[in-house]
Design a protein with these regions (language model features):
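Acidic, Ser/Pro/Thr-rich low-complexity regulatory regions
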Residues: 1-121
Length: 121
């Protein structure tokens, strides 16, 4: 699978990343997704390494690092999982305050889905 966010403006990138993270955490809180799927898609060490190549605030890699801990919290402290997710959700929501989208700049969104992995051989 390949997920790609393409933005000409750093604030556009941060907005899309923030929204993706918020959706994942909210889906976990609402029990609409499972931890393994969300961690696989969003909260992995590779994501942190890729973010280091982009001039964004460290808070984004910190959030992804915190996301890598979700499975550990669920297994070691299951009673604290919702509190942990709510805290993560609040931190993500707080990031929107520092993002200023210019409505003058066109937004380019590219979606890529490789269907070949579903072909029966």
């Amino acid at each position: 699978m390949k997920i790609s966010i393409s933005a000409d403006d750093l604030d556009q990138f941060k907005f899309f990343l923030n929204t993706l993270l918020l959706g994942g955490v909210t889906a976990l809180l609402q029990k609409k997704a499972n931890i393994d799927d969300i961690e696989y898609l969003m909260f992995g060490p590779k994501s942190i390494e890729l973010l280091k190549l982009i001039p964004v605030e460290p808070v984004y890699s910190d959030l992804i690092h915190q996301g890598t801990e979700i499975e550990d919290i669920a297994s070691l402290l299951p009673g604290e999982l919702n509190n942990y997710l709510e805290s993560l959700q609040e931190a993500i929501l707080h990031n929107y305050q520092s993002i200023s989208l210019s409505k003058q700049d066109p937004v380019k969104i590219t979606l890529f889905f490789d269907k070949t992995e579903y072909l029966v051989k």
